[in-house]
Amino acid sequence: MTSTPIDASTAPSFVRHSNRITLGLLRLGLPMGPNVILTVRGRTSGLPRSAPVALVETDGRRWILGAYGEVNWVRNLRAAGEADIAVHGRTEHVEAVELDQVSATAFFRDTLTAYVGRLPRFGRLFARTLFRTISAEEILTDPELAAARRPVFELLPLGRC
């Protein structure tokens, strides 16, 4: 199935508002499930921009996905190709490699569904409810459509900050 990326220049308003709170709590060091702070250089301003993102970590590899489509952090990360992630109080500098359609399809089909399946019951329920709420059910049910609509980046270590 082919599809064009969703035109989602901004996340839903409830997400934008909750992101500010989530970012503040993460900066205070409160654990927020798989959420980490992504800081990337702005593609126009060059200034550091931070956003909370969910980090999928399995078998020593790490990915982040643009669950809301082409949001600003996705565009900035594409332009910069690198970022800092704050994980459990440690900041790491990473290279971000965007997956192509075939690799992203495999990520949604194999990696993400297995990752969500290993979450505690509440985590699984939360993930499924969130994807339904933001009209992104295909993330767990249609890997080809998810890959066409939602960018995925693998994060490769470049060093600690």
PLM-predicted stretches and their roles:
Residues 1-30:
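Extreme N-terminal tail/first-helix region
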Residues 5, 18, 25, 57-58, ...:
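General secondary-structure edge motif
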Residues 58-60, 90, 160:
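Short strand-connecting beta-turns/loops that link adjacent beta-strands
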Residues 11-12, 68-158:
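Short, structured beta-strand-loop surface elements
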